[in-house]
A protein has these predicted regions:
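Bacterial Sec-dependent N-terminal signal peptides
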Residues: 1-23
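Active-site mouth of glycoside hydrolases
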Residues: 27-222, 227-237, 362, 374-388, ...
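Short conserved micro-motifs at the rims of enzyme active sites and ligand-binding pockets
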Residues: 48-49, 267-271, 324-326, 365-366
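Catalytic domains of carbohydrate-active enzymes, especially glycoside hydrolases
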Residues: 74-96, 298-308, 343-345, 349-352
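Short loop/turn segments at secondary-structure transitions that flank enzyme active sites
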Residues: 43-45, 263-265, 359
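Aromatic-rich peripheral "rim/lid" segments of glycoside hydrolase catalytic domains that contact
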Residues: 324-399
């Protein structure tokens, strides 16, 4: 009898140890992301015919078709496979929940919607890809960083994340949760007030508290919190970003800070500059923000947050496609150089990076398309893929 009890005890201990090892810290999670991709303009769409800025919480007519409301086709397993086969091993899935709520008082999620999200997560995990699930374009939350709305919004956010965490809690630690997105005053992307920052901090703490309270795999799940508007400047230099308090025993080990990096915007987002970086100054005007600026900024992230045990997630980044006639090839070569630099420098510091892909193609502002979802996931921005792969290779070299 004693022998049997001892065997049972040893087996229990073995499984407990295995379980502990399976729970990766946030920094381990991020370091294992060679390249991440955003499934943009898909599950964060408003319902067909619904105002994208609406703060209404409910389930309007046609909500089940929100996935295609902004012109992108239905996501299939082939969509995920194409991303995997191109060299990405992580996907961020931005999700709008507010138009899929069956009971606003309880923030209950439509079974059809949550089952669809699970289906896409399952496809990602089948290819052993990491996943970030977030809340994005929740206008009732993101557009009201004010004390007048703080208590009500935190209550709703807690209910929403309780429901998400319970539904997705069975997933292993390849799946991470991100609490909010780009919280900001409407039409104002500039410096926040102390009030705005305080509300963002409250959102972050609410998110961490409620997810941990759901127990199980969520006790040590990788949780990602945000600076105001996901602009790290407002966390690094205002001094008002508060690291949420995790449960006892976790420290900061299972938490990351998220930022979005379209820097400099005049090159990466609006396309006012056609060249970036020291080697390309000979070909035309370049923005003042260059490689040194990027490296110094990344080092600041390490000293401010990485040194405290937090992971760093660049949840969105990208370069709009913009070019001029005969210089198009060289300008695309420059985009490759930017991608290589960012991915290399980020990976050297253990950051994870998730490039934004909105399936928009053309020449101008915010043309962040990489894979053409309307043409069987054909790679149209191969210069972007090239730069990312070069960055991965560069980061593997001894420093």
């Amino acid at each position: 009898m004693k022998t049997k009890l001892r065997i049972c005890w040893l087996l229990t201990l073995m499984f407990a140890v295995m379980s502990c090892h399976a729970q990766k810290t946030a920094r381990q999670w991020n370091s294992e992301v060679t390249a991440g991709w955003n499934l943009g303009n898909q599950f964060e769409c408003s319902a067909p015919g619904q105002d994208g800025e609406s703060m209404d919480i409910g389930e309007p007519d046609g909500a089940d078709n929100a996935e295609t409301a902004w012109g992108n086709p239905v996501v299939t397993k082939k969509t995920i496979k194409a991303v995997h086969d191109a060299g990405f091993n992580a996907i961020r899935i931005p999700i709008r929940w507010q138009c899929h709520i069956t009971n606003p008082a309880a923030m209950s999620i439509s079974k059809t919607w949550i089952d669809r999200i699970k289906e896409v997560i399952d496809w990602c995990l089948e290819y052993d890809m990491k996943v970030i699930v977030n809340v994005q374009h929740e206008k009732w939350l993101e557009s009201r960083p004010f004390y007048a709305n703080k208590e009500e919004n935190c209550r709703k956010l807690a209910l929403l994340w309780m429901n998400i965490a319970n539904e997705l809690g069975k997933y292993d630690d390849r799946v991470a949760f991100a609490g909010t997105n780009e919280v900001h005053v409407p039409n104002n992307w500039g410096k926040p007030t102390a009030e705005n920052l305080d509300v963002q901090n409250a959102y972050n703490q609410t998110f961490v508290d409620i997810v941990r309270a759901t127990g199980g795999n969520n006790v040590k799940r990788h949780l990602i919190v945000q600076t105001y508007v996901c602009n790290a400047d407002f966390g690094l230099y205002n001094g008002d970003f508060v690291i949420p308090k995790d449960i006892e025993g976790n420290g900061n080990d299972y938490m990351s800070v998220e930022l979005h990096f379209y820097n400099p915007w005049e090159y990466a987002g609006s396309g006012e500059y056609y060249y970036w970086g020291e080697p390309y100054k000979q070909y035309g005007k370049t923005p003042q923000s260059d490689e040194t600026t990027m490296v110094n900024f990344f080092d600041k992230l390490v000293s401010e947050w990485g040194s405290k045990g937090l992971g760093i997630v660049i949840g969105e980044w990208g370069i709009t496609d913009h070019y001029k006639g005969s210089e198009a090839d060289r300008m695309h070569e420059n985009v490759s150089y930017y991608c290589k630099t960012l991915v290399s420098e980020a990976r050297k510091r253990g950051f994870s990076t998730f490039i934004w892909d909105n399936n928009r193609f053309g020449n101008g502002s915010e043309m962040f398309g990489i894979f053409d979802r309307n043409k069987n996931m054909a790679i149209k921005a191969d210069w972007v893929i090239k730069g990312i792969k070069e960055g991965i290779a560069e980061s593997a070299k001894p420093m």
